[in-house]
């Protein structure tokens, strides 16, 4: 990224807002010629870099914005839409080899509908995600073989049809670029083979049906993999050498001009609305206060109407380690012994197509664990107990569906490291435990919750199987420990994925329902730490997602809410976690709040190159999913002082770059008699629309209305 000093005396003498043609030879050796306003490129202009890169097109306040053409010294070119320095919108990219892509872009990535023509004669037309073929698409090879169907991460994956130029075809399931699962291979003479396909001959199983004319012939299904598909290789996309957003200069000198004596006080900064609804000329700056925080401070003339500093404290590991002497130490040992037994028990390979009997509530296994051990269980130092597995085949298949490795699963829960108990039980009375690596959360369950999960398990399984990007909680196991002796105590618990298992510190977390009664945390801002779960009336941000992510988010929230409504579930919430990216860049050892100065000519403090490297790094790209590890922006909001229960605050113009995590949690509360009574009782005291306990249909509608107000498209 180059640095451009715009300090010509002529610029300061011109009236504010006047555009004119300028030619700027920059200290770096770069050269700009074109429209110029307020000491920044603004309008149409050309920028030449010393390394041979060139941009010709529209500028807006020092950034490439609108239509433009970027060329590289290698001969590669991009022509199309730009936004904030990124290739974003519709555009055509021709790489140095001659491969051509024409279609949609989001933040330098091929994303949306697009066509790729390869110099060797191959062509792909279809959907893209994060730079790779993903969704529905058609790929045609130069020899006229073609595939039509689903793609994932640049490979044929899902249901699809391959048609060879000789008339043969395969219809069925694909995985990682090859047939996998149920499918039919047909020859041009009418004969066909139907069965289960796999590269592993042991898993291959099917029946060959010859045509009346061909008769029997010697053929092996593995020929499809090693002969028929040998020429059907999908071409890869050449990496873009240097991204335009990485080349964008940082223009220094603009902010100095804006505060010079040539301007009037009222023209120094665009105005913003303060917390009490008044308008102020808040000039803000990001600074360190020397106490482990970064904060945003207003100048003296707008202090009274400012929001005050946004403080982010260093994140600390949650929970208390359960060691010997802890009241739940033996329960933890029992749990670990049971998990090790359940997961390690030999079992036949399972298909994703489960029989109805696997979901039978009576489908459970009891195992006795005497202290001295038995034929099936090891000796242990805990008390004697019984262990129950609910629907073991279903949960084993769910772990397979969620790509959970059995050995890693056991190591996380049953390894040498102890579990951690969260400091206080939830509102429901349940206790929560975290594995030491933060991957899994274990929650104790009431009998009623257990019944709800078992009842909805068939629908839940079908839903998560059909919706790869579902936001609902991932369940990995449902178990029960029954202590022997006089107490005969039963402890039921479910193992879930931890949404905040991440290498990033979670600086803010929110639990959002869309209701207002009791949805406020009483802690003042100064006492809020990263482990504080804030609620609806504490929310002081709007979450801004890129267009394609936002559209996918809306679709998935609708599908998940429809599923929960059909199952008569209510009282669920959207758990949201924010990692402020500037905090990590400023000080990796002590995470602090990063703020983007919201007004005037000041530029973003985050490097675009950092964002590009994050988005295009192969390891990080693979980790980005809907609700997981997503780059986004948040805008700080403020509630009016005269509106006590205002759910969504007014925008302030303060923006922050974040990594956002979110998912729908607490999905095991049905609208039973207790919730109906709660609704009737509270409705006599409070506004019926403000309380959480409402009919599932009304709950779903209110939840979605609220979520779609606080999550918006980042235009």
From Swiss-Prot:
Pfam families: MORN, PIP5K. The keyword Translocase does not apply. GO terms for biological process: clathrin-dependent endocytosis; phosphatidylinositol metabolic process. GO terms for cellular component: apical plasma membrane; pollen tube. Residues 1-13, 265-276 have a biased composition (Basic and acidic residues). MORN repeats lie at residues 32-54, 55-77, 78-100, 101-123, 124-146, 147-169, 170-192, 193-214. Gene3D superfamilies: 2-Layer Sandwich, Histone H3 K4-specific methyltransferase SET7/9 N-terminal domain, Phosphatidylinositol Phosphate Kinase II Beta. It is an enzyme of class 2 (transferase). InterPro entries: MORN, PIno-4-P-5_kinase_pln, PInositol-4-P-4/5-kinase_C_sf, PInositol-4-P-4/5-kinase_core, PInositol-4-P-5-kinase_N, PInositol-4/5-P-5/4-kinase. Residues 321-711 form the PIPK domain. Its EC number is 2.7.1.68. Residues 1-21, 253-306 are annotated as: Disordered. One of its GO terms (molecular function) is ATP binding. Residues 255-264 have a biased composition (Polar residues). The keyword ATP-binding applies. CDD domains: PIPKc_AtPIP5K_like. Keywords: ATP-binding, Kinase, Nucleotide-binding, Repeat, Transferase. It catalyses: a 1,2-diacyl-sn-glycero-3-phospho-(1D-myo-inositol 4-phosphate) + ATP = a 1,2-diacyl-sn-glycero-3-phospho-(1D-myo-inositol-4,5-bisphosphate) + ADP + H(+). Residues 671-692 are annotated as: Activation loop. This is Phosphatidylinositol 4-phosphate 5-kinase 6.
